[in-house]
Amino acid sequence: KECCTHPACHVSHPELCG
């Protein structure tokens, strides 16, 4: 999941990396 590779996005949307 692309968001998971972007720290800021991962922090803002941890559910996308879950």
Curated annotation (Swiss-Prot):
Question: At the top level of its lineage, which domain of life is listed?
Answer: Eukaryota
Q: Which family does it belong to?
A: Belongs to the conotoxin A superfamily.
The name this protein carries in UniProt is Alpha-conotoxin-like Bn1.2
In this entry the propeptide is located at 1
Q: Which controlled-vocabulary keywords does the entry list?
A: Acetylcholine receptor inhibiting toxin, Amidation, Disulfide bond, Ion channel impairing toxin, Neurotoxin, Postsynaptic neurotoxin, Secreted, Toxin
* The record's note on its domains: The cysteine framework is I (CC-C-C). Alpha4/7 pattern.
Report disulfide bridges, numbered on this chain. C3-C9, C4-C17
| Purpose | Alpha-conotoxins act on postsynaptic membranes, they bind to the nicotinic acetylcholine receptors (nAChR) and thus inhibit them. Has possibly a distinct nAChR binding mode from other alpha-conotoxins, due to a different three residue motif (lacks the Ser-Xaa-Pro motif).
Tissue distribution is: Expressed by the venom duct.
Q: Where in the cell is it found?
A: Secreted
Instruction: Give the primary localization class.
Output: secreted
GO MF: acetylcholine receptor inhibitor activity; ion channel regulator activity; toxin activity
Question: What is the source species?
Answer: Conus bandanus (Banded marble cone)
* This protein's GO CC annotations: extracellular region; host cell postsynaptic membrane
Residue ranges, annotated region (Lacks the Ser-Xaa-Pro motif that is crucial for potent interaction with nAChR): 5-7
